[in-house]
């Protein structure tokens, strides 16, 4: 009975709008359809869909660097399905002009950041793509966490767009602060043999913090099959100076 009810419900679900988007292809069309969302299945959602369509198309194109599109919307209120036709001319794109990327603090001398900033995913002259800028921003923060710059933060992040000129200036400054070191290693299991545990360590107190080493220690402990649960976590709130304690829960 439950299966029959589910099948009946699925069969009864029907859209109330027929949508057509023409004039654009590829990533532009894919992004527009993603911003528009699912075709509505109720009259109320249908009205909201139509009212917000232009703004969503504009936002979808701006995310890809197209700030002066021509959008024609035609709505036919036929029943049971309205017909919404959206014709789009994306127009000329905004292109990246100036790129100002700075790594400040101890990470300025870190080869890992040098490699990251040598290939940021876009160049001067490229069409502005907000997704690529955001992707690079996340990579900077992620690398900082992995390499031990746990107090690092982005202190400046902006895109200045001149629509009439068709240009965009990009700025991102990351202040890493100091690179922290491993502090005391705290084990909450008093039954484990200390020599056995020490033989599996992938770092020592005083070594530079590295997320990969934490993961390696956790993997080693898990592979012993001695413990039902293994959790290795940095104790950020208990850090003193440049040392961060590591808690090993077994």
Protein language model annotation of sequence segments:
Residues 1-4:
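Sec-dependent signal peptide recognition
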Residues 7-10:
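N-terminal signal peptide c-region/cleavage motif recognized by signal peptidases
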Residues 13-27, 33-250:
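Periplasmic polypeptide-binding modules associated with outer-membrane biogenesis and secretion
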């Amino acid at each position: 009975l439950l299966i029959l009810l589910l099948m009946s419900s699925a069969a009864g679900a029907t859209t109330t709008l027929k949508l057509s988007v023409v004039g654009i292809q590829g990533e532009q069309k894919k992004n527009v359809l993603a911003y528009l969302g699912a075709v509505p299945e109720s009259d109320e959602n249908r009205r909201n869909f139509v009212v917000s369509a232009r703004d969503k198309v504009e936002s979808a194109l701006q995310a890809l660097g197209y700030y002066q599109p021509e959008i024609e919307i035609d709505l036919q209120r036929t029943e049971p399905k309205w017909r919404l036709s959206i014709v789009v001319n994306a127009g000329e794109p905004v292109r990246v002009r100036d790129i100002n990327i700075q790594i400040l603090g101890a990470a300025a001398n870190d080869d890992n950041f040098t490699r990251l900033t040598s290939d940021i995913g876009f160049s001067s002259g490229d069409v502005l793509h907000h997704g690529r800028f955001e992707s690079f921003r996340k990579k900077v923060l992620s690398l900082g966490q992995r390499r031990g710059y746990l107090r690092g933060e982005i202190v400046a992040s902006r895109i200045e767009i001149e629509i009439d000129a068709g240009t965009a200036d990009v700025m991102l400054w990351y202040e890493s602060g100091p690179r922290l070191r491993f502090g005391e290693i705290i084990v909450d299991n008093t039954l484990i043999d200390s020599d056995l545990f020490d033989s599996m360590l992938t770092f020592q107190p005083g070594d530079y913090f590295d997320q990969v080493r934490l993961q390696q220690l956790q993997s080693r402990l898990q592979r012993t099959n001695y413990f039902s649960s293994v959790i290795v976590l940095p104790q950020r709130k208990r850090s003193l100076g440049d040392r961060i304690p590591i808690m090993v829960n077994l």
